[in-house]
Regions:
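Structured catalytic/nucleic-acid-binding cores of DNA maintenance enzymes
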Residues: 1-126
Length: 127
């Protein structure tokens, strides 16, 4: 299982490549992860710019204009930044497209997670 230092190294590795870029598409190749990948992702994300890439514990938070994508790497998951033209590998589960770049979740054991939390959800209310 990727431990906290590996998750931080992953954050530091992907942030310079995706921060400030607009999501052009999201492809859910196999959404059967620890929790099903929300179908709303494919409609909610395109056109939104990545504001920041943060970490809370072992979760990566990709901050967009209208919410956060929460990513957990599970037991054996990795995130890779690749050219969009690079062929998919067998265990690639979710791909975020940024024009000519792709951010791919590669998770052989399917214990990872990709979740969407819009800023309108209870997480963001200030009472």
């Amino acid at each position: 299982m990727p431990e906290l230092p590996e998750v931080e190294v992953t954050r530091l590795g992907i942030a310079p490549h995706i921060q400030g870029r607009a999501v052009s598409a999201i492809n859910v190749i196999d959404g059967r992860l620890r929790w099903p990948v929300p179908k709303s992702l494919t409609k909610a994300l395109p056109g939104q710019r990545v504001q920041a890439v943060e970490r809370r514990g072992k979760y990566l938070l990709v901050e967009l204009e209208t919410g956060h994508i929460l990513i957990h790497l599970g037991m054996t998951g990795t995130l890779r930044v690749l050219p969009s033209s690079e062929p998919l590998k067998l265990h690639d589960r979710v791909t975020l497209e940024f024009g000519k770049l792709s951010l791919r979740l590669h998770d052989p054991r399917k214990f990872g997670a990709v979740l969407w939390h819009p800023k309108t959800c209870l997480l963001y209310t200030s009472d």
